[in-house]
Amino acid sequence: MTLDPVLARIDADLPVAIDRLFGLLRIPSISTDPAFKADCDRAADWLVEDLRSIGVEASKRPTPGHPMVVGHVDGEGPHLLFYGHYDVQPVDPLDLWDAPPFEPRIEDTPNGKVMRGRGTSDDKGQLMTFIEACRAWKAVHGKLPCKITFFLEGEEESGSPSLIPFMEKNAAELKSDIALICDTSMVSPGVPSIASQLRGMLKDEFTLTGPRIDLHSGHYGGPALNPLAEIARIVAALHDDQGRVTVPGFYEGVYEISDNLRAQWGACGFDEETYLNSVGFTQSHGEAGYSTLELQWARPTLEINGLWGGYQGAGSKTVIPSKAHCKFTCRLVGDQDPDALRDRIRAHVESLLRPDCKIKWDTDLEGSPAPVMNTERPEFEQARKALSDEWSREAVLVGMGGSIPIAGFFKSVLGMDAMLIGFANDDDAIHSPNEKYDVESFHKGIRSWARILAELSA
Protein backbone atom coordinates (compact mmCIF):
# COMPACT_ATOMS: atom_id res chain seq x y z
CA MET A 1 0.00 0.00 0.00
CA THR A 2 1.56 3.27 -1.14
CA LEU A 3 1.68 6.43 0.95
CA ASP A 4 1.53 9.26 -1.60
CA PRO A 5 -2.17 8.89 -2.51
CA VAL A 6 -3.01 8.79 1.20
CA LEU A 7 -1.23 12.12 1.75
CA ALA A 8 -2.98 13.59 -1.30
CA ARG A 9 -6.34 12.48 0.10
CA ILE A 10 -5.55 14.13 3.43
CA ASP A 11 -4.73 17.40 1.68
CA ALA A 12 -7.93 17.34 -0.37
CA ASP A 13 -10.14 16.45 2.59
CA LEU A 14 -8.75 18.99 5.09
CA PRO A 15 -11.81 21.33 5.02
CA VAL A 16 -14.13 18.37 5.60
CA ALA A 17 -11.90 17.08 8.40
CA ILE A 18 -12.05 20.48 10.13
CA ASP A 19 -15.85 20.55 9.83
CA ARG A 20 -16.01 17.06 11.28
CA LEU A 21 -13.80 18.08 14.21
CA PHE A 22 -16.03 21.09 14.84
CA GLY A 23 -18.97 18.72 15.32
CA LEU A 24 -17.10 17.04 18.19
CA LEU A 25 -15.90 20.36 19.60
CA ARG A 26 -19.47 21.65 19.90
CA ILE A 27 -20.19 18.99 22.54
CA PRO A 28 -19.30 20.43 26.00
CA SER A 29 -17.84 17.21 27.41
CA ILE A 30 -16.54 18.65 30.70
CA SER A 31 -15.81 15.54 32.75
CA THR A 32 -15.19 17.13 36.14
CA ASP A 33 -18.67 18.72 36.40
CA PRO A 34 -21.63 16.33 36.88
CA ALA A 35 -23.86 18.82 35.08
CA PHE A 36 -22.17 17.77 31.82
CA LYS A 37 -22.53 14.00 32.21
CA ALA A 38 -25.01 13.74 29.34
CA ASP A 39 -22.64 15.72 27.13
CA CYS A 40 -19.80 13.32 27.88
CA ASP A 41 -22.10 10.49 26.81
CA ARG A 42 -22.90 12.39 23.61
CA ALA A 43 -19.22 12.85 22.83
CA ALA A 44 -18.61 9.12 23.30
CA ASP A 45 -21.56 8.32 21.02
CA TRP A 46 -20.21 10.74 18.41
CA LEU A 47 -16.84 8.98 18.41
CA VAL A 48 -18.39 5.52 18.21
CA GLU A 49 -20.36 6.52 15.12
CA ASP A 50 -17.36 8.21 13.53
CA LEU A 51 -15.13 5.19 14.07
CA ARG A 52 -17.78 2.89 12.67
CA SER A 53 -17.93 5.07 9.56
CA ILE A 54 -14.36 4.01 8.72
CA GLY A 55 -14.91 0.33 9.41
CA VAL A 56 -13.91 0.17 13.06
CA GLU A 57 -15.84 -2.22 15.32
CA ALA A 58 -16.44 0.42 17.99
CA SER A 59 -18.57 0.53 21.12
CA LYS A 60 -19.23 2.68 24.16
CA ARG A 61 -18.21 0.92 27.36
CA PRO A 62 -19.79 1.92 30.69
CA THR A 63 -17.73 2.76 33.76
CA PRO A 64 -18.73 4.14 37.19
CA GLY A 65 -17.95 7.54 35.67
CA HIS A 66 -17.89 8.56 32.02
CA PRO A 67 -17.76 5.89 29.31
CA MET A 68 -14.75 4.59 27.44
CA VAL A 69 -14.80 4.18 23.67
CA VAL A 70 -13.07 1.05 22.40
CA GLY A 71 -12.70 0.01 18.79
CA HIS A 72 -10.83 -2.61 16.79
CA VAL A 73 -9.64 -3.02 13.22
CA ASP A 74 -8.01 -6.29 12.26
CA GLY A 75 -5.03 -6.35 9.95
CA GLU A 76 -1.57 -7.66 9.24
CA GLY A 77 1.68 -6.53 10.80
CA PRO A 78 2.05 -4.89 14.21
CA HIS A 79 -0.83 -4.38 16.62
CA LEU A 80 -0.99 -0.72 17.62
CA LEU A 81 -3.16 0.83 20.32
CA PHE A 82 -4.09 4.49 19.96
CA TYR A 83 -5.12 6.48 23.05
CA GLY A 84 -6.73 9.90 23.29
CA HIS A 85 -9.33 11.57 25.50
CA TYR A 86 -12.59 13.23 24.50
CA ASP A 87 -13.27 15.09 27.75
CA VAL A 88 -12.22 18.71 28.23
CA GLN A 89 -11.42 21.17 30.98
CA PRO A 90 -14.01 23.58 32.44
CA VAL A 91 -14.21 26.94 30.68
CA ASP A 92 -14.06 29.25 33.71
CA PRO A 93 -13.53 32.18 33.75
CA LEU A 94 -16.05 32.48 30.95
CA ASP A 95 -15.79 36.27 30.72
CA LEU A 96 -12.19 35.97 29.49
CA TRP A 97 -13.21 34.11 26.33
CA ASP A 98 -13.45 36.22 23.19
CA ALA A 99 -16.28 34.02 21.90
CA PRO A 100 -18.34 31.10 23.26
CA PRO A 101 -15.93 28.22 23.99
CA PHE A 102 -18.11 25.54 22.41
CA GLU A 103 -18.74 27.41 19.18
CA PRO A 104 -15.49 26.55 17.34
CA ARG A 105 -14.26 28.81 14.59
CA ILE A 106 -11.31 29.54 12.32
CA GLU A 107 -9.33 32.69 13.02
CA ASP A 108 -6.58 34.41 11.06
CA THR A 109 -3.61 35.34 13.26
CA PRO A 110 -0.15 36.78 12.53
CA ASN A 111 1.19 33.21 12.75
CA GLY A 112 -1.41 31.66 10.47
CA LYS A 113 -4.88 30.19 10.75
CA VAL A 114 -5.98 28.66 14.05
CA MET A 115 -9.01 26.76 15.26
CA ARG A 116 -10.36 28.38 18.41
CA GLY A 117 -12.48 26.67 21.09
CA ARG A 118 -12.32 24.39 24.12
CA GLY A 119 -10.79 21.04 23.23
CA THR A 120 -9.21 22.13 19.96
CA SER A 121 -5.74 21.27 21.26
CA ASP A 122 -6.49 19.25 24.41
CA ASP A 123 -7.37 16.73 23.19
CA LYS A 124 -10.13 16.47 20.61
CA GLY A 125 -8.15 18.08 17.81
CA GLN A 126 -5.17 15.89 18.57
CA LEU A 127 -7.03 12.59 18.76
CA MET A 128 -8.80 13.37 15.50
CA THR A 129 -5.43 13.71 13.73
CA PHE A 130 -4.99 9.97 14.15
CA ILE A 131 -8.56 9.10 13.21
CA GLU A 132 -8.36 11.28 10.09
CA ALA A 133 -5.12 9.56 9.07
CA CYS A 134 -6.88 6.21 9.39
CA ARG A 135 -9.83 7.57 7.42
CA ALA A 136 -7.53 8.53 4.54
CA TRP A 137 -5.84 5.10 4.53
CA LYS A 138 -9.26 3.43 4.46
CA ALA A 139 -10.56 5.68 1.66
CA VAL A 140 -7.54 5.12 -0.58
CA HIS A 141 -6.70 1.47 0.06
CA GLY A 142 -9.94 0.05 1.44
CA LYS A 143 -8.27 -0.98 4.69
CA LEU A 144 -5.80 0.18 7.31
CA PRO A 145 -2.13 -0.82 7.05
CA CYS A 146 -2.06 -2.78 10.31
CA LYS A 147 -4.11 -3.99 13.26
CA ILE A 148 -5.27 -1.09 15.45
CA THR A 149 -7.13 -0.80 18.75
CA PHE A 150 -8.69 2.57 19.58
CA PHE A 151 -8.96 3.46 23.28
CA LEU A 152 -10.60 6.82 23.99
CA GLU A 153 -11.17 8.01 27.56
CA GLY A 154 -13.71 10.44 29.01
CA GLU A 155 -12.14 11.17 32.42
CA GLU A 156 -8.56 12.28 31.72
CA GLU A 157 -9.26 15.85 32.84
CA SER A 158 -10.86 14.67 36.09
CA GLY A 159 -8.17 12.31 37.36
CA SER A 160 -9.05 9.13 35.39
CA PRO A 161 -10.77 7.38 38.34
CA SER A 162 -12.19 4.60 36.13
CA LEU A 163 -9.10 4.04 34.02
CA ILE A 164 -7.08 1.45 35.94
CA PRO A 165 -10.10 -0.73 36.87
CA PHE A 166 -11.22 -0.69 33.23
CA MET A 167 -7.74 -1.56 31.96
CA GLU A 168 -7.41 -4.39 34.48
CA LYS A 169 -10.82 -5.81 33.58
CA ASN A 170 -10.18 -5.59 29.83
CA ALA A 171 -6.44 -6.29 29.77
CA ALA A 172 -6.62 -9.13 27.25
CA GLU A 173 -8.62 -7.01 24.82
CA LEU A 174 -6.39 -3.93 25.13
CA LYS A 175 -3.00 -5.67 25.08
CA SER A 176 -1.06 -4.56 21.98
CA ASP A 177 2.52 -4.29 20.76
CA ILE A 178 2.85 -0.60 21.63
CA ALA A 179 0.57 2.29 22.63
CA LEU A 180 0.49 5.56 20.69
CA ILE A 181 -0.62 8.65 22.61
CA CYS A 182 -1.45 12.00 21.00
CA ASP A 183 -1.82 14.43 23.91
CA THR A 184 1.49 16.28 23.96
CA SER A 185 3.11 19.29 22.31
CA MET A 186 6.09 20.19 20.16
CA VAL A 187 9.08 21.75 21.86
CA SER A 188 8.83 24.73 19.48
CA PRO A 189 6.53 25.50 16.54
CA GLY A 190 7.42 23.31 13.59
CA VAL A 191 9.80 21.07 15.57
CA PRO A 192 8.34 17.53 15.62
CA SER A 193 8.79 16.03 19.07
CA ILE A 194 8.52 12.65 20.74
CA ALA A 195 8.16 12.79 24.51
CA SER A 196 10.64 10.54 26.30
CA GLN A 197 9.61 11.50 29.83
CA LEU A 198 6.75 13.25 31.59
CA ARG A 199 6.04 14.42 35.10
CA GLY A 200 3.73 12.62 37.47
CA MET A 201 0.87 14.22 39.36
CA LEU A 202 -0.35 14.59 42.93
CA LYS A 203 -3.55 16.49 43.78
CA ASP A 204 -4.81 17.50 47.20
CA GLU A 205 -6.93 20.10 48.92
CA PHE A 206 -7.77 21.15 52.45
CA THR A 207 -10.07 23.38 54.45
CA LEU A 208 -9.05 25.36 57.52
CA THR A 209 -11.64 26.23 60.14
CA GLY A 210 -11.11 28.90 62.78
CA PRO A 211 -14.23 30.19 64.55
CA ARG A 212 -17.40 28.10 64.40
CA ILE A 213 -19.17 30.86 62.43
CA ASP A 214 -18.23 34.03 60.56
CA LEU A 215 -17.44 36.74 63.11
CA HIS A 216 -17.96 40.51 63.27
CA SER A 217 -14.50 41.96 62.59
CA GLY A 218 -15.09 44.74 65.11
CA HIS A 219 -16.26 42.54 67.95
CA TYR A 220 -13.63 39.82 67.40
CA GLY A 221 -10.91 41.44 65.29
CA GLY A 222 -7.64 41.11 67.22
CA PRO A 223 -8.15 38.12 69.50
CA ALA A 224 -9.75 35.91 66.83
CA LEU A 225 -7.77 33.56 64.61
CA ASN A 226 -8.47 34.36 60.95
CA PRO A 227 -8.31 31.20 58.79
CA LEU A 228 -7.71 33.26 55.64
CA ALA A 229 -4.62 34.82 57.17
CA GLU A 230 -3.54 31.41 58.45
CA ILE A 231 -3.90 29.72 55.08
CA ALA A 232 -1.94 32.53 53.41
CA ARG A 233 0.84 32.14 55.99
CA ILE A 234 0.99 28.37 55.52
CA VAL A 235 0.97 28.54 51.72
CA ALA A 236 3.72 31.17 51.73
CA ALA A 237 5.84 28.90 53.93
CA LEU A 238 5.75 26.00 51.44
CA HIS A 239 8.60 27.55 49.38
CA ASP A 240 11.81 29.25 50.44
CA ASP A 241 13.25 32.38 48.83
CA GLN A 242 15.15 30.22 46.30
CA GLY A 243 11.97 28.60 45.05
CA ARG A 244 12.60 25.23 46.70
CA VAL A 245 9.75 23.38 48.36
CA THR A 246 10.26 23.28 52.13
CA VAL A 247 8.42 20.02 52.83
CA PRO A 248 10.90 17.61 54.47
CA GLY A 249 11.66 14.73 52.10
CA PHE A 250 9.99 16.42 49.12
CA TYR A 251 13.02 15.87 46.86
CA GLU A 252 13.52 12.21 47.75
CA GLY A 253 13.71 10.27 44.47
CA VAL A 254 14.60 13.36 42.40
CA TYR A 255 17.72 12.98 40.28
CA GLU A 256 19.89 15.46 38.43
CA ILE A 257 19.89 15.03 34.66
CA SER A 258 23.10 14.10 32.85
CA ASP A 259 25.27 16.65 31.11
CA ASN A 260 24.58 14.84 27.83
CA LEU A 261 20.81 15.17 28.22
CA ARG A 262 21.19 18.79 29.30
CA ALA A 263 23.15 19.45 26.09
CA GLN A 264 20.51 17.71 23.96
CA TRP A 265 17.75 19.80 25.46
CA GLY A 266 19.80 22.94 24.96
CA ALA A 267 20.07 22.18 21.24
CA CYS A 268 16.42 21.27 20.59
CA GLY A 269 15.34 24.69 19.34
CA PHE A 270 13.41 25.86 22.39
CA ASP A 271 12.77 29.63 22.27
CA GLU A 272 12.80 30.63 25.94
CA GLU A 273 12.06 34.31 25.32
CA THR A 274 8.98 33.59 23.22
CA TYR A 275 7.82 30.94 25.69
CA LEU A 276 8.01 33.40 28.60
CA ASN A 277 6.82 36.51 26.77
CA SER A 278 3.74 34.71 25.46
CA VAL A 279 2.34 34.62 29.01
CA GLY A 280 3.60 38.02 30.14
CA PHE A 281 6.90 37.07 31.80
CA THR A 282 10.28 38.66 31.21
CA GLN A 283 12.29 36.02 33.06
CA SER A 284 12.06 32.49 34.38
CA HIS A 285 10.81 32.04 37.95
CA GLY A 286 10.98 29.08 40.28
CA GLU A 287 13.73 26.95 41.75
CA ALA A 288 17.07 28.72 41.40
CA GLY A 289 19.94 27.16 39.48
CA TYR A 290 18.02 25.42 36.69
CA SER A 291 17.19 26.31 33.10
CA THR A 292 13.60 26.88 32.02
CA LEU A 293 13.46 23.49 30.29
CA GLU A 294 14.92 21.73 33.33
CA LEU A 295 12.33 23.40 35.55
CA GLN A 296 9.57 22.34 33.17
CA TRP A 297 10.71 18.79 32.43
CA ALA A 298 13.01 17.51 35.17
CA ARG A 299 12.18 19.28 38.44
CA PRO A 300 9.20 18.71 40.74
CA THR A 301 6.78 21.46 41.71
CA LEU A 302 4.18 22.30 44.32
CA GLU A 303 1.69 24.75 42.81
CA ILE A 304 -1.24 26.47 44.50
CA ASN A 305 -4.22 26.13 42.14
CA GLY A 306 -6.90 27.81 44.21
CA LEU A 307 -7.12 29.79 47.45
CA TRP A 308 -10.38 31.24 48.68
CA GLY A 309 -12.69 32.05 51.56
CA GLY A 310 -14.66 34.85 53.15
CA TYR A 311 -16.90 37.33 51.40
CA GLN A 312 -16.73 37.29 47.58
CA GLY A 313 -19.60 39.62 46.64
CA ALA A 314 -19.70 43.26 45.61
CA GLY A 315 -18.78 45.89 48.16
CA SER A 316 -17.41 44.95 51.56
CA LYS A 317 -18.52 42.78 54.44
CA THR A 318 -16.65 43.20 57.70
CA VAL A 319 -16.30 39.59 58.76
CA ILE A 320 -13.64 37.23 59.98
CA PRO A 321 -14.52 34.11 57.97
CA SER A 322 -15.01 30.74 59.57
CA LYS A 323 -13.30 28.78 56.81
CA ALA A 324 -10.57 29.07 54.17
CA HIS A 325 -9.80 26.64 51.35
CA CYS A 326 -6.77 25.61 49.31
CA LYS A 327 -6.30 23.37 46.27
CA PHE A 328 -2.80 22.40 45.17
CA THR A 329 -1.04 20.03 42.82
CA CYS A 330 2.47 18.65 42.58
CA ARG A 331 4.25 17.65 39.39
CA LEU A 332 6.50 14.70 40.16
CA VAL A 333 9.74 13.49 38.56
CA GLY A 334 12.13 10.58 38.88
CA ASP A 335 11.12 8.08 41.56
CA GLN A 336 8.96 10.38 43.69
CA ASP A 337 6.18 8.32 45.28
CA PRO A 338 2.85 10.21 45.19
CA ASP A 339 1.40 8.43 48.22
CA ALA A 340 4.48 8.97 50.39
CA LEU A 341 4.73 12.56 49.23
CA ARG A 342 1.10 13.26 50.08
CA ASP A 343 1.74 12.04 53.62
CA ARG A 344 4.80 14.28 53.93
CA ILE A 345 3.00 17.36 52.66
CA ARG A 346 0.04 16.83 54.95
CA ALA A 347 2.29 16.29 57.96
CA HIS A 348 4.24 19.46 57.15
CA VAL A 349 1.13 21.58 56.69
CA GLU A 350 -0.31 20.28 59.95
CA SER A 351 2.94 21.10 61.73
CA LEU A 352 2.41 24.75 60.74
CA LEU A 353 -1.09 24.98 62.25
CA ARG A 354 -1.69 27.21 65.25
CA PRO A 355 -3.94 26.27 68.19
CA ASP A 356 -7.68 26.52 67.44
CA CYS A 357 -7.05 26.12 63.70
CA LYS A 358 -8.58 22.85 62.48
CA ILE A 359 -7.85 21.17 59.14
CA LYS A 360 -9.85 18.79 56.95
CA TRP A 361 -8.26 17.05 53.95
CA ASP A 362 -9.93 15.76 50.81
CA THR A 363 -9.95 11.96 50.85
CA ASP A 364 -10.76 11.03 47.22
CA LEU A 365 -7.79 12.36 45.26
CA GLU A 366 -5.20 10.07 43.65
CA GLY A 367 -1.71 10.54 42.28
CA SER A 368 0.48 9.01 39.59
CA PRO A 369 4.27 8.63 39.39
CA ALA A 370 6.37 10.03 36.56
CA PRO A 371 6.63 7.63 33.59
CA VAL A 372 9.74 7.21 31.44
CA MET A 373 9.49 5.90 27.87
CA ASN A 374 11.56 3.03 26.43
CA THR A 375 13.23 4.95 23.61
CA GLU A 376 15.37 1.94 22.63
CA ARG A 377 12.40 0.33 20.89
CA PRO A 378 12.67 0.42 17.06
CA GLU A 379 9.30 2.15 16.79
CA PHE A 380 10.84 5.35 18.15
CA GLU A 381 13.37 5.54 15.33
CA GLN A 382 10.69 4.67 12.77
CA ALA A 383 8.47 7.45 14.11
CA ARG A 384 11.38 9.90 14.13
CA LYS A 385 12.00 9.18 10.45
CA ALA A 386 8.32 9.67 9.57
CA LEU A 387 8.10 12.93 11.50
CA SER A 388 11.36 14.24 10.06
CA ASP A 389 10.14 13.50 6.53
CA GLU A 390 6.87 15.36 7.11
CA TRP A 391 8.23 18.42 8.91
CA SER A 392 11.48 18.67 6.89
CA ARG A 393 13.61 18.79 10.01
CA GLU A 394 14.90 16.24 12.48
CA ALA A 395 12.43 15.09 15.09
CA VAL A 396 13.69 15.40 18.67
CA LEU A 397 13.23 13.47 21.89
CA VAL A 398 12.03 15.82 24.62
CA GLY A 399 10.64 15.92 28.12
CA MET A 400 7.17 17.18 28.95
CA GLY A 401 6.10 19.20 31.94
CA GLY A 402 2.58 17.84 32.03
CA SER A 403 1.21 14.61 33.44
CA ILE A 404 -0.41 11.90 31.34
CA PRO A 405 -1.05 9.03 33.78
CA ILE A 406 -2.07 6.64 31.03
CA ALA A 407 1.53 6.56 29.77
CA GLY A 408 2.64 4.89 32.99
CA PHE A 409 -0.50 2.76 33.34
CA PHE A 410 0.12 1.05 30.00
CA LYS A 411 3.37 -0.28 31.46
CA SER A 412 2.22 -1.01 35.01
CA VAL A 413 -1.16 -2.53 34.12
CA LEU A 414 -0.71 -4.00 30.64
CA GLY A 415 3.07 -4.42 30.41
CA MET A 416 3.13 -2.24 27.28
CA ASP A 417 5.50 0.52 26.25
CA ALA A 418 4.06 3.78 24.98
CA MET A 419 5.15 6.45 22.52
CA LEU A 420 3.88 10.01 22.92
CA ILE A 421 3.63 12.17 19.82
CA GLY A 422 1.65 15.40 19.71
CA PHE A 423 1.39 18.51 17.59
CA ALA A 424 0.23 21.16 20.05
CA ASN A 425 2.18 24.37 20.68
CA ASP A 426 2.96 26.03 24.00
CA ASP A 427 0.77 29.02 23.08
CA ASP A 428 -2.33 26.88 22.53
CA ALA A 429 -3.76 28.04 25.89
CA ILE A 430 -4.89 24.57 26.91
CA HIS A 431 -6.89 24.66 30.18
CA SER A 432 -7.23 28.44 29.65
CA PRO A 433 -9.63 30.83 27.92
CA ASN A 434 -9.34 31.09 24.12
CA GLU A 435 -7.76 27.67 23.63
CA LYS A 436 -6.59 27.16 20.04
CA TYR A 437 -4.97 24.64 17.72
CA ASP A 438 -3.04 25.70 14.64
CA VAL A 439 -4.60 24.53 11.39
CA GLU A 440 -1.09 23.61 10.26
CA SER A 441 -0.65 21.42 13.36
CA PHE A 442 -3.93 19.65 12.61
CA HIS A 443 -3.11 19.19 8.92
CA LYS A 444 0.49 18.09 9.34
CA GLY A 445 -0.49 16.03 12.37
CA ILE A 446 -2.82 13.96 10.18
CA ARG A 447 -0.09 13.60 7.55
CA SER A 448 2.42 12.67 10.26
CA TRP A 449 0.27 9.84 11.56
CA ALA A 450 -0.26 8.58 8.02
CA ARG A 451 3.51 8.44 7.58
CA ILE A 452 4.03 6.82 10.99
CA LEU A 453 1.49 4.11 10.16
CA ALA A 454 3.35 3.45 6.92
CA GLU A 455 6.71 3.20 8.70
CA LEU A 456 5.45 1.00 11.53
CA SER A 457 3.69 -1.32 9.07
CA ALA A 458 6.57 -1.65 6.60
Region spans (language model):
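Zn-dependent metallopeptidase/amidohydrolase metal-coordination segment
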Residues: 207-209, 231, 298, 316, ...
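A short beta-alpha structural unit
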Residues: 330-333, 360-376, 401
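Histidine/acidic-residue-rich, glycine-tolerant segments that coordinate divalent metal ions
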Residues: 145-226
